[in-house]
Amino acid sequence: MSRRVKKLNQLFRADISALLQKEVRDPRLDTLLSVNEVDVSEDMRHATVYVSHLAGDEHKDEILAALNAAAGFFRTEIAKKTDIRYMPVFNFIWDDTIERGVRLNTLIDRVTQHQPED
């Protein structure tokens, strides 16, 4: 991954987070929504935005629908502040790494509790 793409990943993550906090008025997108990572393609035409919600994935489909419906808004607002040749198309994906990590830790705890100590 080039240094430029890494910088754009950081920039887009910060900008989308700020827009979610200050500009977006959709009630499905509350302050518990977290932008975990942005992955811009090497040609800078597409960006995958990984999001999660602190309350879990209960309303995952509604949240993703709202975010993908607002993708053009994010693209337009960020383009106003950014001087890059191509503004990528944003695609929002649910990031379940936190939930998987919690499940993995739970399984590890169960296994270690059932093993006899040496």
UniProtKB/Swiss-Prot annotation:
Q: Which cell locations does it reside in?
A: Cytoplasm
Cystine residue pairs: none
From which domain of life does this come? Bacteria
Any one GO CC term of this protein is: cytosol
One GO term of the biological process aspect: maturation of SSU-rRNA
- The principal localisation class reads cytoplasm
Return one GO MF term: ribosomal small subunit binding
Family (UniProt): Belongs to the RbfA family.
Q: What does this protein do?
A: One of several proteins that assist in the late maturation steps of the functional core of the 30S ribosomal subunit. Associates with free 30S ribosomal subunits (but not with 30S subunits that are part of 70S ribosomes or polysomes). Required for efficient processing of 16S rRNA. May interact with the 5'-terminal helix region of 16S rRNA.
Q: State the name under which the record lists this protein.
A: Ribosome-binding factor A
Q: Which organism is it from?
A: Dehalococcoides mccartyi (strain ATCC BAA-2266 / KCTC 15142 / 195)
> Which gene specifies this protein's sequence?
rbfA
